[in-house]
């Protein structure tokens, strides 16, 4: 006892404080666990759990009110799939403690304003939906909710604002109606009719230039590719016609109607949508993905129609589950297959359709592509007797519709399918796809199979791929990924540079230095010597050919051998590739050596950019060069180009970040500076200001390179597409060839995948390249892109 008392005296009672803090933390953690887990599988009914939890929270309100408020606001934002469970809980708390209900509504409005200010529009939709469902729980008075929606729809009358801003407020209103439409119409039918009329008027006049760029398929058969607001409007119209009868939303508050209807309600404070600013970034429009209908599962429960509001609710809830649990594939899969009401719907079909809808979403999926692969694999493990069959059916449907599928989505389909096969011993009924063998190799189906097998080889090895596919598919199988060394056989003796290649080979094997290699290359004759331009003397194609061919041949054993070779003879590479022509020729020779190994080409280009042997513009020019024309539509070529663009973008962002950090550091120094004359601080400021000036120059230079890269890419696209269009017009043939479809959609892909960066250079692109004189087929792509954020 004395020791304990002595300890208290010395510590000023700190252990007691710590125990208090520890107890408080334990209680808070317990409350968080209870709130987050309500609605999960339990021996008791949901209603019983909600009533019990409301009692626990009410008892803890005196001590933990701010924590409970914060938790409930967070789950409203982050767990939208359990929306009605939490609105019921708030309703029960409001019935027991009116003041708490008022504070919660105020906190939600604050959170909504913060989300809109921070451009978190997806979360803001969930908050609006939550508030609207509180009307059903007698927490919020219906007239004040109608007033808020009136303010939302009034945004459609704003002038000089982007259409995507108006779209969001209309979507926030319409997407809440499956939950609260009936209640609002019963209380305020005239006002709701007026809002509906304004909404309809807006939807009729809004522009939809962007739609073709966002469609997964160019054809509307068998399922229309509807713009998201058009589809939702049709669903709400049908719901209204059906007298707001909706049969799928879980509504636990109905069990507590006698309690909730006695509660006092709160009026929402007047809500004015925050004005549009230059920093406002609204969600892009979407096209609704449809793959299945009721005919695809004739034996199971009937799938709701595409304009049924149940279809919207189911899909919305499944998207919410993926959004909440995507980082944990096992949990995510378990949550999806245990979806409430699963016995009333063909759940596996809905799950597969929703996953592919996200994977194929343009311009980009909500989550990293590989997540969808791992999630589908996990679902196949959880439901081995049913889900693999639905997935196979979906794969067959996608294959059958390849002719009209967006090239970007075909790329994702290739990557998903090859990765999926690698997890199931590459088993597939290839004979079912033998129709592709009679088609032109550039047609979508044989091209798809070829690219899938190429990707499968990356995940396996060449001989294994030959073994798993029928012999009839040999024309579509990838080539043996071996190095092609032009100086390697006897017939090469007469080739220019053959003797130098032999000398280089011996030197490389003897671990020669860069200077020794320069010495061997010194006397290689220059075919460009006759040129008058200065670059002709510096650019020696034969010297590059002999050096690159021989070095890559000797380093062909593995990726790491090739990387080591690039690193060891980096000085030679830099000297030979000093000019633009030199950089281009290094890439050409590398491609000749590894033309049968796309993966090696990709990693070597990546390494050459990182080590500054070649630059991004050189890679872009190489991709559009005549040497690559035979492989121009191959997937690996476009993976290289997109990787190159991403590297340039990262480079610019890195320097911009360094500049911002330097500016912040200078601002902190100014803030800390005392009133005294501190010459040391002046010196530090001077050094920092010089650093900022240098970084500013680097940023401007990098941005200039970035802009130039996009100008090169778009200029080359315009040139080759214009040549094709003129040739077709001259010959009197159709422009709609497989090559044209691939090329014009690759142009769309560049715009979509790098839209945030390209938007910075819109004025330059419009003034220099995408002018009114351009062919309408090409100009249409630019106009569709402009409409995405218009």
From Swiss-Prot:
Subcellular location: Nucleus; Cytoplasm
Residues that bear Phosphoserine: 7, 22, 201
Residue numbers bearing the Phosphothreonine modification: 21
Keyword annotations: Acetylation, Coiled coil, Cytoplasm, Isopeptide bond, mRNA capping, mRNA processing, mRNA splicing, mRNA transport, Nonsense-mediated mRNA decay, Nucleus, Phosphoprotein, RNA-mediated gene silencing, Translation regulation, Transport, Ubl conjugation
Span of domain MIF4G: 28-240
One GO BP annotation of this record: regulation of translational initiation
Per UniProt, location of the Glycyl lysine isopeptide (Lys-Gly) (interchain with G-Cter in SUMO2) cross-link in this chain: 684
Gene Ontology terms for molecular function: molecular adaptor activity; mRNA binding; RNA 7-methylguanosine cap binding; RNA cap binding
Subunit composition and interactions: Component of the nuclear cap-binding complex (CBC), a heterodimer composed of NCBP1/CBP80 and NCBP2/CBP20 that interacts with m7GpppG-capped RNA. Found in a U snRNA export complex containing PHAX/RNUXA, NCBP1/CBP80, NCBP2/CBP20, RAN, XPO1 and m7G-capped RNA. Identified in a IGF2BP1-dependent mRNP granule complex containing untranslated mRNAs. Interacts with PHAX/RNUXA, SRRT/ARS2, EIF4G2, IGF2BP1, HNRNPF, HNRNPH1, KIAA0427/CTIF, PARN, DROSHA, UPF1 and ALYREF/THOC4. May interact with EIF4G1; the interaction is however controversial since it is reported by, and, but is not observed by.
Keyword Nucleotide-binding among record annotations: no
Name this protein carries in UniProt: Nuclear cap-binding protein subunit 1
Coiled-coil intervals, chain numbering: 643-713
Entry GO CC: cytoplasm; cytosol; mitochondrion; nuclear cap binding complex; nucleoplasm; nucleus; ribonucleoprotein complex; RNA cap binding complex
Post-translational modification: Dephosphorylated at Thr-21 by the PNUTS-PP1 complex during RNA polymerase II transcription pause-release.
Spans annotated as Disordered: 1-26
Keyword presence, Coiled coil: yes
């Amino acid at each position: 006892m004395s020791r304990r008392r002595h300890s208290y005296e010395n510590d000023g009672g700190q252990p007691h404080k710590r125990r208090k803090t520890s107890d408080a933390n334990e209680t808070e953690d317990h409350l968080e666990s209870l709130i987050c887990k309500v609605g999960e599988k339990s021996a008791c009914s949901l209603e019983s759990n909600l009533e019990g939890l409301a009692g626990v929270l009410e008892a803890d309100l005196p001590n933990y009110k701010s924590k409970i408020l914060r938790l409930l606001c967070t789950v409203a934002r982050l767990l939208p799939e359990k929306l009605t469970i939490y609105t019921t809980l708030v309703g029960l708390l409001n019935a027991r403690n009116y003041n708490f209900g008022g504070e919660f509504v105020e906190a939600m409005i604050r959170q909504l304003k913060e989300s809109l200010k921070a451009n978190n529009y997806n979360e803001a939709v969930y908050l609006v939906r939550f508030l609207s469902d509180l009307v059903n729980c007698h927490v919020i008075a219906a007239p004040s909710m109608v007033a808020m929606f009136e303010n939302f729809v009034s945004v459609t009358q704003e002038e000089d604002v982007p259409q995507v801003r108006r779209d969001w407020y209309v979507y926030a209103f319409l997407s809440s109606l499956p939950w609260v439409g009936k209640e609002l119409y019963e209380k305020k039918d005239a006002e709701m009719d007026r809002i509906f009329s304004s909404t309809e008027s807006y939807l009729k006049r809004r522009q939809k230039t962007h739609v073709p760029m966002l469609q997964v398929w160019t054809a509307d058969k068998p399922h229309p590719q509807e713009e998201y607001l058009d589809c939702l409007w049709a669903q709400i119209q049908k719901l209204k016609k059906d007298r707001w009868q909706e049969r799928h939303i879980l509504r636990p508050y109905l069990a507590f109607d006698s309690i909730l209807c006695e509660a006092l309600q709160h009026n929402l404070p007047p809500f004015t949508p925050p004005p549009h600013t230059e920093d406002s970034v609204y969600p892009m429009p979407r096209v609704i993905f449809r793959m299945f209908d009721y005919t695809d599962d004739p034996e199971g429960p009937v799938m709701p129609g595409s304009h049924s509001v149940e279809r919207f609710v189911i899909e919305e809830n499944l998207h919410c589950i993926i959004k909440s649990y995507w980082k944990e594939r096992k949990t995510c899969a378990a949550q999806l297959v245990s979806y409430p009401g699963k016995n009333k719907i063909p759940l596996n079909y809905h799950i597969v359709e929703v996953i592919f809808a996200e994977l194929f979403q343009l311009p980009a999926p909500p989550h990293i592509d590989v997540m969808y692969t791992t999630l589908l694999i996990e679902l196949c493990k959880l439901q081995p007797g049913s889900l693999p069959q639905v997935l196979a059916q979906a794969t067959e449907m996608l294959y059958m519709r390849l002719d009209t599928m967006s090239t970007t989505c075909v790329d994702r389909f290739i990557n998903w399918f090859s990765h999926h096969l690698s997890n199931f011993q590459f088993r597939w009924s290839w004979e079912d796809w033998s129709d592709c063998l009679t088609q032109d190799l550039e047609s979508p189906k044989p091209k798809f199979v070829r690219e899938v097998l190429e990707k499968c080889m990356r995940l396996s090895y060449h001989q294994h791929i030959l073994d798993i596919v029928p012999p009839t598919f040999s024309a579509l199988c990838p080539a043996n990924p071996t190095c092609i060394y032009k100086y390697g056989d006897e017939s090469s003796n007469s080739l220019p540079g053959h003797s130098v290649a032999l000398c280089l080979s011996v030197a490389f094997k003897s671990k020669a230095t860069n200077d020794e290699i320069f010495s061997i290359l010194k006397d290689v004759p220059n075919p460009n010597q006759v040129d008058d331009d200065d670059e002709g003397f510096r650019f020696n194609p034969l010297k590059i050919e002999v050096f690159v061919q021989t070095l890559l041949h000797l380093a062909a054993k593995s990726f790491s051998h090739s990387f080591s070779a690039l690193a060891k003879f980096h000085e030679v590479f830099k000297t030979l590739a000093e000019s633009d022509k030199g950089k281009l020729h290094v890439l050409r020779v590398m491609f000749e050596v590894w033309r049968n190994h796309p993966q090696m080409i990709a990693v070597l280009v990546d390494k050459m950019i990182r080590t500054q042997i070649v630059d991004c513009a050189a890679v872009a020019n190489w991709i559009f060069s005549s040497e690559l024309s035979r492989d121009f539509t191959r997937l690996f070529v476009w993976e290289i180009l997109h990787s190159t663009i991403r590297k340039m973008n990262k480079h610019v962002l890195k320097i911009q970040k360094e500049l911002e950090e330097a500016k912040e550091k200078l601002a902190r120094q100014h803030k800390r500076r005392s009133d005294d004359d501190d010459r040391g601080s002046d010196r530090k400021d001077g050094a920092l200001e010089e650093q900022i000036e240098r970084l500013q120059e680097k940023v401007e230079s990098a941005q200039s390179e970035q802009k130039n890269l996009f100008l090169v890419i778009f200029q080359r696209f315009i040139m080759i597409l214009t040549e094709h269009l003129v040739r077709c017009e001259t010959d009197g043939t159709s422009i709609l060839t497989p090559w044209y479809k691939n090329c014009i959609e690759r142009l769309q892909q560049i715009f979509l995948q790098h839209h945030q960066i390209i938007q910075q250079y819109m004025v330059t692109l419009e003034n220099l390249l995408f002018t009114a004189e351009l062919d309408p087929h090409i100009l249409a792509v630019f106009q569709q892109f402009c409409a995405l954020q218009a």
